[in-house]
Amino acid sequence: MPSSQISHQDPELGQTSSGSSSIKEKAEPQLYAGPIDPARRPDVFQEGFEDVSVTDDDNDNELLRKMGYQPVLHRSFEFFESFAASFASLDVVSGVRLTFSWGISFGGPAAYWSAMLVTGFCSIVTAACLAEICSALPAAGSIYLWAAESAGPRFGRFVSFLVAWWSTTAWTTFVASITQSTANFIFAEVSTFNNPWPTNDSDVKFRAVQWIVAEVLLVFTILLNQVPPRYYKWIFKASMLLMFIDYVMNIIWVPVATSKKPDGFRSAKWVFTETIYDQAGYIKEVDDANGNPIASLSKIVPKGWQWCLSYFATAGVIVGYDASGHIAEETKDASIKAARGIFYSTVTSFIVAFSLAILYLFCCPDLDTFTAILYNDNSPQPFVNFYSYLLGRGGHVVMNVVIILEIFLNGVVSVLACSRLVFAVSRDGVLPFSNWISQVSKTGQPKNAITVIYIVSALLLCTILPSAVAFTSLVSAAGAPSFAAYAVLAFCRLFITRDKFPKGRWSLGWLSKPCLVITLVYNLFALVVNVSPYTYPVTGPSFNYAVVIMGGVSIFAIICTIVIPKSRWVANRYRYESDSEHSASVKELKV
């Protein structure tokens, strides 16, 4: 092992790699984000290390040291902040609005509500599996470290690199998509008030303005993440308050307004049994240059697959609940509170999402009006038109202001979770420029990781300029890598470390393996749906680039696994070396 990698100072003993030592009563605060000396790192697979949990807040940092890391982040979050991190990142109140028209277009109301029900159940099961893992390994970056442990000594390094790149891609694209959706809700007011200024995504001039506004919103989102950690609690509270107000306004105001419309509510039969197969190309007639129908392009999307595509509108809403795990190093009694944050935020999100989906279905206008409103090409966010139809111009503006502020603050929370993931991955040497990215400020803030998120998200927003379906691709790219990572975790725990994985205080017991099977099957299915095309026939401008992003990121992960020396990969390093290599490294440490 190169001496440059072992020359850091042990904060407990005050001893350097040169062999000199100074006895200290108390170690000075360290901002070094790297691991403890490898010779001191325990192997979590060794006997006597199965339970890595603690029962006292004061032992949180000791638990982190047992996992091999120096505690450098500011630990101040309680269960509320852990819950809010995932709940705000999911933001299903906004998510249902963003994808509602897609859910109806693929299979109709029957497909949409049933897909939401299945998605909710499977997401809760997946969250339970992640919570069990988080309880055993509550560290920043969570899912990346969990992958290393789940894949075992033989495959851990490769799988962790793959999941690290997938997860960082998912969260950075998620940040970009949030800022763009915020801009869409702003510009939707233009078409609502019949302003002649074009707001059609096919207009490149509008996309240029849309891009500028999204970039500005991203800057403010990043700036709010530069505040000292003690102020984050207020951001969490403000975000939760706005989501509560938004939800209450919807469940009270929307049905009251619907009852005053001539058509009133839709029937239960329409909501629960109606199918619609005319939006994704099933009976769409495609003409040639002479205006004659092209038979080969008629009925190009089978009904069964259209039904499956409705899961894009539901699975993409309830994903990202690993956020509580990303801030585990800043959460007190994390082995319990972070795990509960993952699970209960997902349960609550499903209840909110399902209730809103059913509410909106009952409040839908007749099909012609519905099509004119929610498939309005002149509005970047047609759901604003739906509110305008129900609540009137004045009422819908109030609702839209709450929505815009809510999405913006949830973007701030998402950057918080994402920055902890990027920090954790870089401190283990997985990303390029890891030494710089993993540096932490005096206030325990990974500011360089936040800067990296800004740069990547800003570049991703540039896809708005050439593509009219960039937003759809960003949403898919935000969900697809997460589904892939969840599936890989379940696969590894089922087939590689099924009886070896460390146990935490939050456990599923005998239900663990059945839940892992459900997690694996569901997330593989959701992955396929999220990378598939949505507009037919598929052309360059309408292509879903999520599959390209996933493929490119996977290639980068494989290249990094090959190029980056094994000695630079810090997490559980000695689990991947032979006994002779381990002994030689320990001997070098003692020289």
From Swiss-Prot:
The keyword rRNA-binding does not apply. GO terms for cellular component: endoplasmic reticulum; endoplasmic reticulum membrane; medial membrane band; plasma membrane; plasma membrane of cell tip. It holds the Pfam family AA_permease_2. Keywords: Amino-acid transport, Cell membrane, Endoplasmic reticulum, Membrane, Phosphoprotein, Transmembrane, Transmembrane helix, Transport. Residues 1-42 are annotated as: Disordered. GO terms for molecular function: gamma-aminobutyric acid transmembrane transporter activity; high-affinity thiamine:proton symporter activity. It comes from Schizosaccharomyces pombe (strain 972 / ATCC 24843). This is Thiamine transporter thi9. The modification Phosphoserine is found at residue 585. PANTHER family: AMINO-ACID PERMEASE BAT1, THIAMINE TRANSPORTER THI9. Thiamine transporter involved in the cellular uptake of thiamine. Pyrithiamine, oxythiamine, amprolium, and the thiazole part of thiamine have been shown to be also substrates of thi9. The chain crosses the membrane at residues 98-118, 342-362, 397-417, 450-470, 545-565. It is found in: Endoplasmic reticulum membrane; Cell membrane. Residues 1-22 have a biased composition (Polar residues).
